[in-house]
Amino acid sequence: MATTGRVLLVGKRAQVLDRLAEALRAEGLQVRQETDLDRIRTQVDVSAVDVLALGRAVTGERRERLVAAVRARNPALRVVDGLAPITPLLVAQIQEALTAPGTESRIVAAAGVEVSDRSVAISLRRGADVTVVYHRLDSLYRAHEQLLHSGPLGRGHHWFPVKGTVTRGERFLVVRADGQTTVHQLV
């Protein structure tokens, strides 16, 4: 899905930023990377940025100061807090920020995990061509990805079995439905 937009990536680990920047450029986005928060506040033209994507290491007061300083110069800026260092997941989060309609206009109404039968569930407001990808970050910070569905689905609730564990690690679902991308943290 090609999306246009300008993204500023901010994080601690240059290697993660490099992989993410490469993937975003492949999607047609303009990307700048930064690991120095002070430089962003003083030297980066944030008026030319659509999305500020923050890594998980940018938290607390440092995050709040940065977002406030950047939003003071660009009130329309969308901020994405990276859920996990999983490149396809982060790409989906940024695509969601760039293209998401209002909550009521979203095709995907809800998503969740069904621990008892090792599956994930989604609820659609209308029928659509849907791709569902399950991401998991295990306790050793290894990323696991499973394509659960790709094809048409009708309106309503749908369940998809997950191979392996659904109870360990950090879990996420990326759902693409007729050009809309939504990211769901599964708890």
Residue ranges and their predicted role:
Residues 4-14, 20, 52:
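Conserved acidic segment of CheY-like receiver
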Residues 54-69:
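Conserved phosphotransfer microenvironments
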Residues 69-107:
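Ser/Thr/Gly-rich flexible loops in soluble cytosolic domains mediating phosphotransfer, phosphorylation
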Residues 160-162, 166-179:
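Short, aromatic- and glycine-rich surface loops/edge beta-strands on solvent-exposed regions
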